[in-house]
Curated annotation (Swiss-Prot):
Gene: murA
Family: Belongs to the EPSP synthase family. MurA subfamily.
A GO cellular component entry from the record: cytoplasm
Keyword Amino-acid biosynthesis listed: no
Entries under NCBIfam families matching the protein: murA, PRK09369.1
HAMAP family listed in its UniProt record: MurA (MF_00111)
Binding annotation for UDP-N-acetyl-alpha-D-glucosamine: 121, 150-154, 333, 355
Protein name in UniProt: UDP-N-acetylglucosamine 1-carboxyvinyltransferase
Pathway(s) per entry: Cell wall biogenesis; peptidoglycan biosynthesis
Matches recorded under SUPFAM superfamilies: EPT/RTPC-like
Residues modified to 2-(S-cysteinyl)pyruvic acid O-phosphothioketal: 145
Length: 449
């Protein structure tokens, strides 16, 4: 049986459940953003912790009975949903701003129900930790998703190679194992969440596990660093071959989540498109090399500090060709934002999407703003125009919504971006951060609309 799970933006699906946890859910399902374009951006923006690192790291808290202390955790809807899911299992958590303390000593319900999994595909990441520590896990299959999918088969195949008995019935993956055994696992494709799930499971397995064709994303590396801090034995971190020596137990640890390279890239792209001079703080340039290279090609000046990135842009950008691929190549999660940049650039450029089969849904909305984009299969030809014009547009997924915000910053007149609950899944207070550097962006709550 083949089932599917989104790999890179593991949580792009529509949220319908009310997130729990101590963090306040500040977004309403019908909120909109009103953007008055044409302003240069200037000032500083603090980059939040990485969503795609925080979610597996929160799930890794299940691997130990001792407290795991996390810093730089972003305040996002998906983080709150993950904490709600872990809380249902018996995990206790304390949250103070960007600091979260997890205590899994009393976890007694190793089940991830459909009600939460359908809102967030990253919920599959509890499968490996639950099975490794408790010998049992029951996790709902992820539901439908807007932008295409990748198979969860790789997770199941890898766990079966480690000795797990897995049955899929009534929409649930039910997995059992007295203790997982080390194995050599070769994934059919590069899978981020699959690598993370198998890596977490292998830390408590009996013997050596080798994961070949492992994902190399910085978020996978960040998870591995937390696991090592908890007592795991992992070699090959940052490469496509991970070697894990299983241990009897993992202990507590303290860890800071890496900066969000996609949030940083989105703001860099916004400045390159709209013009300005902005410094990003709390950012590591080396995890964003492919994006920085393309922005320089577009004409932006980017200065790299120890933990800062300064971007300066005058005039129109130059069109740049993009081809998405696995890290360290150009990330699929930045494709839509560069589409918006190319929409106002001088010249024309091709954008080719190789990761997802259905990730051009923002094209129709960008064209509503006056962009000139033609799609042919997995390639889009973007011919830049001097100016976009404000209009009402609708977000279809997380990164598409970011591209519409960037386009709105460049457009003449007002742009109204609807369904921004997508944006809130992956960006911590985007409108607040943009307003602080001179953008005219305001949230219209559902009650006002």
């Amino acid at each position: 049986m083949q089932v599917t799970v989104n790999e890179h933006d593991a949580v792009e699906c529509v949220a319908t459940a009310t997130p729990a946890g101590n963090r306040e859910a500040h977004a309403h399902g019908t909120d909109k953003l009103a953007i008055e374009g044409g302003r240069r951006l200037a000032g500083e923006i603090a980059v939040s912790g990485a969503k795609n690192a925080a979610l597996p790291i929160l799930c890794a808290g299940l691997l130990s009975a001792e407290p795991v202390r996390l810093d730089n955790v972003p305040d996002l809807k998906d983080v709150r949903t993950t904490l709600a899911l872990l809380g249902q299992m018996g995990m206790r958590e304390e949250t103070d701003g960007a600091r979260v303390v997890l205590d899994a000593s009393r976890v007694d319900n190793p089940v991830a129900p459909y009600e939460l999994v359908k809102t967030m595909r990253a919920s599959i990441l509890v499968l490996g930790p639950l099975l490794a520590r408790f010998g049992y896990a029951k996790v709902s299959l992820p539901g439908g998703c807007a932008i295409g999918a990748r198979p969860v088969d790789q997770h199941i195949k890898g766990l079966q190679a480690m000795g797990a008995e897995i049955h899929i019935e009534h929409g649930y993956i039910e997995a059992r194992a007295k203790r997982l055994s080390g194995a050599r696992i070769v994934t059919d494709m590069i899978t981020v969440t699959g690598t993370e799930n198998l890596l977490m499971a292998a830390t408590l397995a009996d013997g050596e596990t080798v994961i070949e064709n492992a994902a190399r994303e910085p978020e996978v590396t960040d998870l591995a660093h937390l696991l090592v801090a908890m007592g795991a034995k992992i070699d090959g971190i940052g490469t496509d071959r991970l070697v894990i020596q299983g241990v009897e137990r993992l202990h507590g640890a303290t860890h800071a989540v890496i900066p969000d390279r996609i949030e940083a890239g989105t703001f860099l792209c916004a400045v390159a498109a709209a013009g300005g001079d902005v410094t990003l703080t709390g950012m590591r340039a080396h995890i964003l090399d492919a994006v920085i290279d393309k922005l320089r090609e577009a004409g932006a000046t980017i200065d790299e500090g120890v933990d800062t990135l300064r971007v300066r842009m005058d005039g129109r950008p130059s069109a740049v060709a993009i081809r998405t691929s696995e890290y360290p190549a150009f990330p699929t999660d930045m494709q839509a934002q560069f589409m918006a940049l190319n929409a106002v650039a001088q010249g024309a450029a091709q954008v080719t999407e190789t990761i997802f089969e259905n990730r051009f849904m923002h094209v129709q909305e960008l064209n509503r703003l006056g962009a000139n984009i033609a799609v042919d299969g997995n390639t889009a030809l973007v011919t830049g125009v001097p100016k976009l014009s404000g209009a009402s547009v609708m977000a279809t997924d997380l990164r598409a919504s970011a591209s519409l915000v960037i386009a709105g910053l460049c457009a003449q007149g007002e742009t109204l971006v609807e369904r921004i609950y997508h944006l809130d899944r992956g960006y911590d207070r985007m409108e607040t951060k943009l307003t602080a550097v001179g953008a005219n962006v305001r949230r219209i709550s559902g009650s006002e609309a």
